[in-house]
Structure formats: C-alpha cells, structure tokens
C-alpha cells in the first residue's frame, strides 16, 4: 500500500490521476491544448503499469495470507480431532456404546431382592428390552418382563450420556443420577451446564478478540497522533523560520528602497548639471548666430562701398603685420564710440580705408575673443548648425529609468542569491565542523576513560607491589639480615616509593 500511495503521489505531481489512463485536459483527439510530451506519456504508462502490478500483487498477497490463516485453522481443528480420536480410543474400552441418549428408570420390581442368578437374568432381560425399545425393534410389551413407565417424583434416575465426536464415532458416559423432586416428576440432566460454559468461553474469546482489535486500533491512532504532532511541530518551526525570513526580507527591501532613493538623487545631480551646461551652450550658440548676422550685414555694407569706390584706394596704406596689430590694439577702446559715430549720414565723408581697417580689426578681435565659438570657421549647414532639437536626446526618458531600475532589481536578486548560496555553504561548513568537534570530543572522552582505567590499574599494581615489598621486608627482618643490607633495602624501597609518588603527582594534573 505504501508503494501504491507513493506512485499515486508521483502521478499527481506529473499532473495525471494515479489510476487513470490520461489527464483530463489531454484526453480526446480534438483538444485545444497541446498534448503531453513523449517522455511524460512514457513515464505515465510506466507508472500506471507499475501501479496495476502492485495492486495485483497486493491482492494476491492478501489472498495468500487468508489461505494461510485458513490452513492454520484447519490444522488446529485436525489436531484437536486427532487428540479426541485418541482419547476416544482409550475410553471405548471402559464405556458401553449406544446409538442414542437413553435414561432408564428403576422400578419397584427391579429393586426387589432376589437371587443372584435371577437378578442377573432379570437385569440382562431388562437391558435387552431397553435396547430393543431404544432401537425400535420390539414393542413396549414384547419383553419377558413388562416395562414400568411410571415416573414417580423422588425416584433415582440412572443417566447415560452419548457424545458424538467429529469422526463419526459415539461415546457414552454413565452417571449415577440425582434425587430431585419436581411437581411433574421430570428428572434434570447434570450435563446441561456444559453448553453454557462453552457459550461463555465463546463470548470470552469474542470479547478478547474485540479487546485486541480495540487495542490495535488505539495503538494505530496513538501512532498517527504522534506523527501528526511531530508534523505540526515541524510546520510550526517552518512557519516561525518563514516569518523570520520574511522580516529579514522586509528589512532588506526597506534598505534597498533607501539606497534606491540615494542612487536616484546621485543620478539626478549630474543630470541637472548636464541640463545647465546644455542651456549655457545653447545660449552661446544663439549669441554667436546673432553676432554672425551682424558681421554679415557689415560685410555687405563694406562690399557695397568697395564696389562704389576705387579698390586701389582701399589698399593704399598697408603697414606691416606688427604695425597693423598694434593699431588694432589701439583702436579696440574706440570701437563702440566709432560704431555709434559712423552713422549712415557720415559714411560718405569718411575714408573707406579707415572703415576697412576698423572692420578687419573688429573681425580679428571677435575671432581672438570667442575661442570656444569659432564662429568664423563655421558653415551654416545641417551638420554644424546647433539648435535645441540637437539636445533632446540628452534628456533622460522614462524607458531609460525603467531599464536602470530593472538592472538594479536584477543586481539585487543576484546579490540575494549569492548571499543565500554563501549562507548554505557556511551552514554546511559549520555542520561539518560541529561533527568533527563531536567526534573529537567523543575520542577525547574515550581516551580519558582509558587513561583513567590505566591509572586505576596502575594504582592497584602499586598497592600490590607495596604489599609484596612489605612482605619481603618482613620476611627479611624475620631472617635477621645484616644491618647494611637492611639499610640498603630500606633506602631502595623508600626511593621507589618516592618515585611512584612523583609519578602520581605528575599524572594528576594531566587527568584534571
């Protein structure tokens, strides 16, 4: 039954009932869901065949046990019958055999005194007539002496019991009878108590069987209760451990949430710095674009003046590069005033050469001042023109934040799994170390007990040696040895005793 239950649980674990052909969802050819895999089907068939085989073996074993019990019962009955046959064989030599139970009443005529021969003949005739009447071969009045059927109260009955055995034989037992007075004059048999005793024995046997059955059931229930109690204790311990683990996980989650907030704050600071830098760069670009527009307008004015005037006059006075640079430095302070001074009304009266010099100096100043912009080297095309749309990709999006949070969650899970693995390894190492410590402790205790036994044996031997030494010394004193030998023996014995005491003193701290 244990194997069948085990295979049933395995079959339920694979998703199919233990005794059925297939799962409910997989039956039928037109099912909507996909069918089971070949490995699952093969395993299911194997489990089904094994369960069927185990059930058959279980039934056969039960039948075999029933047959064995039946044969044992029959054997006991046959042994009892054999004993009864043997006892019957011994009793047949002492008792008469009758075909049925018969009670014979002794009448007044049979009780009269008569001669020995006539009494014996009368008794024989009476017995023959009684047997004939019992067998139904003779009529009631066909004997040599008439039968007396009067049953008077208070007379003596001779009782004969016929016992039938199982082998077909008949056993008779004759009793002396009883004297009993009844209003109807009916005698009562003594052996009527035997069936009641047998019934009492049967009732007692039945009660004993019921008691044994109840005791067996009580033991089974007690074992089940103990198993359930241990299971409940185990589940309570597991629940407590789960609660502790849940509390630890909640603490970890709170700590990780706080760390996540800190990480978000750390990430938001560089993002804000980047936004400010982007805005500053965009403002510089806008200012450069406006400056380029102004320079282009001034260049157009210069070109118009060049076309209207003689070109040779423009480049009349062209000093050296150093002189021109010094002049440009001197004219920097006068730039704003001259720009405002030379309005559209006074353009015709000014020298075009001075205007061109001023414009070139202004361009050079602009070029040397804005090194980061490089406005003169740019070309307005799609590759170099910077607008606000170029910086939209720098802003963090929600998808990027979600990916970062997902990566952080994966990192947290990996860290937790790593910690769990390390915890398991630590637990295994601790268990191994505890086992080794227990083994070492047991070995130390065993060695200590052995050492104590050896010390006790040594003390016993020392006592025996001291006793022998004293006996030898006493015998030597009785033999009256010389004083020198006595002194030497005494000194030797004292030296040995002192050495033994020193050894015991060395051993005692080691034992403690």
Curated annotation (Swiss-Prot):
This is Intermediate filament family orphan 2. It comes from the Eukaryota. Residues 496-512 have a biased composition (Acidic residues). Residues 480-492 have a biased composition (Low complexity). Keywords: Coiled coil, Intermediate filament. Residues 50-479 form the IF rod domain. Pfam families: Filament. The gene is Iffo2. Belongs to the intermediate filament family. One of its GO terms (cellular component) is intermediate filament. The keyword NAD does not apply. Residues 473-512 are annotated as: Disordered.
């Amino acid at each position: 039954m244990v194997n069948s239950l085990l295979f049933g649980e395995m079959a339920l674990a694979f998703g199919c009932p233990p005794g059925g052909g297939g799962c409910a969802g997989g039956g039928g050819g037109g099912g909507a869901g996909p069918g089971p895999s070949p490995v699952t089907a093969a395993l299911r068939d194997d489990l089904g065949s094994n369960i069927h085989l185990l059930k058959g073996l279980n039934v056969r074993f039960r039948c075999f046990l029933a047959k064995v019990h039946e044969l044992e019962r029959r054997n006991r009955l046959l042994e009892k019958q054999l004993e009864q046959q043997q006892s019957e064989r011994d009793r047949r030599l002492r008792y008469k055999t009758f075909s049925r139970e018969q009670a014979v009443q002794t009448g007044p005529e049979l009780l009269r005194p008569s001669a020995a021969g006539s009494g014996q003949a009368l008794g024989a005739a009476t017995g023959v007539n009684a047997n004939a009447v019992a067998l139904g071969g003779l009529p009631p009045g066909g004997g040599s002496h008439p039968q007396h059927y009067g049953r008077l109260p208070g007379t003596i009955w001779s009782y004969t019991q016929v016992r039938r055995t199982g082998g077909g034989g008949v056993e008779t037992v004759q009793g002396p009878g009883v004297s009993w007075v009844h209003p109807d004059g009916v005698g009562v048999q003594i052996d009527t108590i035997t069936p009641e005793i047998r019934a009492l024995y049967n009732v007692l046997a039945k009660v004993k069987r019921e008691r044994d059955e109840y005791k067996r059931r009580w033991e089974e229930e007690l074992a089940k209760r103990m198993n359930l109690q241990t299971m409940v204790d185990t589940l309570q311990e597991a629940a407590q451990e789960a609660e502790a683990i849940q509390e630890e996980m909640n603490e970890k989650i709170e700590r990780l949430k706080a760390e996540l907030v800190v990480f978000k704050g750390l990430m938001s600071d560089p993002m804000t710095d980047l936004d400010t830098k982007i805005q500053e760069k965009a403002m510089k670009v806008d200012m450069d674009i406006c400056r380029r527009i102004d320079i282009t307008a001034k260049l157009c004015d210069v070109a118009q003046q060049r076309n209207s005037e003689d070109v040779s006059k423009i480049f009349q006075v062209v000093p050296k590069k150093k002189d021109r640079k010094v002049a440009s430095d001197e004219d920097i302070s006068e730039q704003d005033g001259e720009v405002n001074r030379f309005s559209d009304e006074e353009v015709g009266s000014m020298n075009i050469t001075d205007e061109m010099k001023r414009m070139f100096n202004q361009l050079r100043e602009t070029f040397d001042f804005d090194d980061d912009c490089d406005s003169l080297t740019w070309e307005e095309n799609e590759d170099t023109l910077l607008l606000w749309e170029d910086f939209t990709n720098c802003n963090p999006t929600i998808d990027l934040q979600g990916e970062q949070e997902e990566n952080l969650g994966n990192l947290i899970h990996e860290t937790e799994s790593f910690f769990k693995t390390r915890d398991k390894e630590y637990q295994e190492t601790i268990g191994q170390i505890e086992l080794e410590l227990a083994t070492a402790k047991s070995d130390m205790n065993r060695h200590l007990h052995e050492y104590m036994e050896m010390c006790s044996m040594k003390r016993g031997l020392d006592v025996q040696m001291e006793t022998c030494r004293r006996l030898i010394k006493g015998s030597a004193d009785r033999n009256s040895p010389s004083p020198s030998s006595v002194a030497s023996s005494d000194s030797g014995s004292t030296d040995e005793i002192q050495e033994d005491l020193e050894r015991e003193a060395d051993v005692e701290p080691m034992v403690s």
